[in-house]
Each structure stands twice: as structure tokens, then as C-alpha cells.
Amino acid sequence: MRHYEIMIILDPAQDERTVAPSLDKYLDVVRKEKGNVDKVDIWGKRRLAYPIQKKEEGIYVVVDFTCESATVLEVDRLLNLNDSVLRTKVLRTDA
């Protein structure tokens, strides 16, 4: 298993208190595949460097987890299907 970090930018219209519960649905995919979610860090609403889907702000979330590569692809695919997710970026970290 490898260690990954995923940055997610969410639609700013979403309430910040509902971010963690809405992400649990996607992080359960990691847990079901015998992976481990190490840390979920919600940075909150920040200004974007450039507009994404005509939005000037976004809610930033960084998630550190350990799992197989196929699981990462599935989590990224599910996140991109969600309309409230503006952008995702997955990085494999050396941990």
C-alpha cells in the first residue's frame, strides 16, 4: 500500500459544517478496501488563483490516506462525478 494526499476544492455555496459528513461517503471507499484515512484537514473558504467554473472562491480540503492505487482511482472518479467538487488533485507522497 502507498501513501497518498488528495486536495479537493469544493463549491463555496456549500455550508462548511457539511463538508466533513459529505466527504465521509467517499472516504468509506478507502476504508472498505482495507485502506487507512490518516488525516482530513479542512482549510475552509479561500480565494482561487483563477476562476474555476465561474467561481472565485472554493472550500479547500486536504486528505492524507494509505491504500492501493486502484482505490485512489475510484475515489478520484467518484469525487469528479459530484457537482459540488470543483477540482481534485491526487499526489503520491513518500511517507
Swiss-Prot record:
Pfam families: Ribosomal_S6. SUPFAM superfamilies: Ribosomal protein S6. GO terms for cellular component: cytoplasm; ribonucleoprotein complex; ribosome. The keyword Ribosomal protein applies. GO terms for biological process: translation. Gene3D superfamilies: 3.30.70.60. InterPro entries: Ribosomal_bS6, Ribosomal_bS6_sf, Ribosomal_S6_plastid/chlpt, Transl_elong_EF1B/ribsomal_bS6. The keyword rRNA-binding applies. It comes from the Bacteria. Disulfide bonds: none annotated. Keywords: Ribonucleoprotein, Ribosomal protein, RNA-binding, rRNA-binding. GO terms for molecular function: small ribosomal subunit rRNA binding; structural constituent of ribosome. Transmembrane segments: none annotated. HAMAP family: Ribosomal_bS6. Belongs to the bacterial ribosomal protein bS6 family. Binds together with bS18 to 16S ribosomal RNA. This is Small ribosomal subunit protein bS6. It comes from Corynebacterium kroppenstedtii (strain DSM 44385 / JCM 11950 / CIP 105744 / CCUG 35717). The gene is rpsF.
